[in-house]
């Protein structure tokens, strides 16, 4: 099985402006437990300080998964059981915030490269290694560090099949 960490490609693409919005307040107050469903059909603008090109993956703050309707339509049936989607509108164009479910006990702690705070909390994971014998949904976040979203190979392949998509980057993770 192949597992990929997905994230926004920083390459001159526009970003969704959250500064000064209720969404920013919710993220600051709740961190990784923010509930995006509260913002269904809310209108957003592009940030003035971002790039010039609109992409299909304008993640919020670099790690909150946002897909264009084109991409979401391609993978909807694969992820509906493991993620919640919230429709938002950015300057007239529909996007979907995707909140993948958190799963636990799938990260191979011994093989992963993890940087920790003095109190033991995870600061960063430089190398994600997943357990071979675990069960994985099509899309997920890990309970230990729910900052990034991961997909299995079939989901990434379906995304890649959507012609003309831009803005997604991904990293293959080890499965041992």
What name fits each language-model region?
Residues 1-176:
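Phosphate/anion-contacting hairpin/loop surfaces
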């Amino acid at each position: 099985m192949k597992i990929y960490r997905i994230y926004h490609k920083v390459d001159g693409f526009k970003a969704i402006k959250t500064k000064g919005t209720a969404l920013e307040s919710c993220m600051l107050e709740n961190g990784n437990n923010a509930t995006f469903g509260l913002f269904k059909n809310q209108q957003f603008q592009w940030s003035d300080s971002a790039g010039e090109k609109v992409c299909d993956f304008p993640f919020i703050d670099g790690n909150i998964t946002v897909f264009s309707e084109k991409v979401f339509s391609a993978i909807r049936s694969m992820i509906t059981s493991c993620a919640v989607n919230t429709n938002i509108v950015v300057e007239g164009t529909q996007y979907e915030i995707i909140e993948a479910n958190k799963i636990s006990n799938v990260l191979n702690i011994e093989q992963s490269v993890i940087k920790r705070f003095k109190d033991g909390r995870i600061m960063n994971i430089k190398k994600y290694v997943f357990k071979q014998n675990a069960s994985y949904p099509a899309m997920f976040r890990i309970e230990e560090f729910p900052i990034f979203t991961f997909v299995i190979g079939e989901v990434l392949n379906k995304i890649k099949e959507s012609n003309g998509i831009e803005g997604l980057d991904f990293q293959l993770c080890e499965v041992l």
